[in-house]
Amino acid sequence: VHLTDAEKALVTGLWGKVKPDELGGEALGRLLVGYPWTQRFFDSFGDLSSASALMGNPKVKAHGKKVLDSFSEGLKHLDNLKGTFASLSELHCDKLHVDPENFKLLGNMLVLVLAHLLGKDFTPAAQAAYQKVVAGVATALAHKYH
């Protein structure tokens, strides 16, 4: 993904204001609520029967944190997202068989949750920069798909 130095500074600066453990659970939970067909990948997570069950589910929160920890690592390597996410791409392609479109959906949820959490600090420029990043991450995660 091509980001200017200003966009990189904006993305990493704002990232320091969020708590990935909270943000990840919120974004993943919203994905599972808004796009219920994505729940099929999380059968082992227990009660996914309603929005409140999903949003309060400790396994959803834990996996959301794991996702955001990986995203945080990606922010350290914005010039090499494909390399950074190569093993996760392979896992999601070959073992989990996740539809790569889901990566885009989760990225959009992440941007929405960031906008909500950061309020006025999440300027149009910040949104544009984050949209580039989540698109780049989604592309990197889809890289190993045939």
Curated annotation (Swiss-Prot):
SUPFAM superfamilies: Globin-like (SSF46458). GO terms for cellular component: blood microparticle; haptoglobin-hemoglobin complex; hemoglobin complex. GO terms for molecular function: haptoglobin binding; heme binding; hemoglobin alpha binding; metal ion binding; organic acid binding; oxygen binding; oxygen carrier activity; peroxidase activity. The modification N6-acetyllysine is found at K59, K82, K144. Residues 2-146 form the Globin domain. PROSITE patterns: GLOBIN (PS01033). Heme b binds at H63, H92. Belongs to the globin family. Involved in oxygen transport from the lung to the various peripheral tissues. Heterotetramer of two alpha chains and two beta chains. This is Hemoglobin subunit beta.
